Amino acid sequence: MFSNYCFLPFILLQESDDSMESPLPANTNRDIIKQNDKPMSTSILKTASKINPHGLGIVYLDNYQMIKLKSSEYKTLKTKRPFIAHFRYKTKGVVSKANTHPFVCGSNTDELLMHNGTISGYGSDKMTDSEQLAIELGSMPRQAWKNKLSKYDSRFVAINTHKKSFEYLGMSIFSKNFTNFNPLLKK
């Protein structure tokens, strides 16, 4: 599907090498989508953990199992299993596993949402902006999500654990500015 890509704020990886320098500029990457069976670079994972220290949410793409950990437990991602991972940097809500992505979308427990950015007008000290938006999306048909999320200057990954599928919604995940930082991108 993808080959040799890294993008901001999502990193799409097909190949990895532990000797490679981390392509992560400070305060940027939070989500990693790994769709192959090669373990990721420890330096990439460590850097993501350091700059986004407030939680780690993972959905494994082989069985769509979700787990939530501390960012410091990044070595869990040293696996051959494909996954989508979100390293949290707190902007709204408290630091807790409950406030770590992905979020269940309302009462539809098959639908999950990961998000990068801040949604104006959403969130509080008790609930993150992403969690509030996920709850709202849960009351809408999935087909309406694209229109709703395109209104925000943000990027989203919507995951359906029953259908074992995911898609990108909202702003384009591809950042042309990132190629300067990306040793994995082959021209």
Question: Which residues are covered by each model-predicted region?
Answer:
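A generic structural motif
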Residues: 59-61, 104-106, 159-161
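Short coil/turn connectors at secondary-structure junctions
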Residues: 79-81, 108-110, 153
